[in-house]
């Protein structure tokens, strides 16, 4: 079982790590008040970066609450998100949502991100390999 902590290795920390996701996102999940950008990281665990600016969420209390709730949701879903670098970008109105609504919205966003993940075809899944026939 993967630990559900949120240590330094589970966070995007440097500008270079954020730029890698911004420059070439593989997964993009827009929501009404949020945008998720994701990129595969080649690691066995996911990493999270948050972009919650004063322009979109005015009060520091709201920004801190959002960060806390997003990190908590990420922590509980990190087993299914393994191998991704994810950047969450807040849009106007995100700070006005209530906590249960935020939990529900992020649960749906994580699932949508997983649905959009490009599938890597293993040799056993390739046509003709599993049944012994060749093209």
From Swiss-Prot:
GO terms for molecular function: 3'-tRNA processing endoribonuclease activity; ribonuclease P activity; tRNA binding. Belongs to the RnpA family. Pfam families: Ribonuclease_P. Transmembrane segments: none annotated. It is an enzyme of class 3 (hydrolase). Consists of a catalytic RNA component (M1 or rnpB) and a protein subunit. GO terms for cellular component: ribonuclease P complex. Keywords: Endonuclease, Hydrolase, Nuclease, RNA-binding, tRNA processing. Its EC number is 3.1.26.5. SUPFAM superfamilies: Ribosomal protein S5 domain 2-like. The gene is rnpA. It comes from Pseudomonas aeruginosa (strain LESB58). It catalyses: Endonucleolytic cleavage of RNA, removing 5'-extranucleotides from tRNA precursor. RNaseP catalyzes the removal of the 5'-leader sequence from pre-tRNA to produce the mature 5'-terminus. It can also cleave other RNA substrates such as 4.5S RNA. The protein component plays an auxiliary but essential role in vivo by binding to the 5'-leader sequence and broadening the substrate specificity of the ribozyme. GO terms for biological process: tRNA 5'-leader removal. This is Ribonuclease P protein component.
């Amino acid at each position: 079982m993967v630990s559900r902590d949120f240590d330094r290795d589970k966070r995007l920390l440097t500008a270079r790590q954020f730029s890698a996701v911004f420059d070439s996102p593989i997964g993009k999940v827009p929501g009404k008040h949020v945008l998720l950008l994701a990129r595969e990281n080649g690691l066995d665990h996911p990493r999270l970066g948050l972009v919650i600016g004063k322009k979109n969420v005015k009060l520091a209390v709201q920004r801190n609450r959002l960060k806390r709730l997003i990190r908590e949701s990420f922590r509980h879903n990190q087993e299914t998100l393994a191998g991704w670098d994810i950047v969450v970008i807040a849009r106007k109105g995100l700070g006005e949502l209530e906590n249960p609504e935020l939990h529900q919205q992020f649960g749906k966003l994580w699932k949508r991100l997983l649905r959009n993940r490009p599938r890597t075809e293993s040799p056993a899944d390739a046509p003709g390999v599993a049944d012994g026939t060749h093209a």
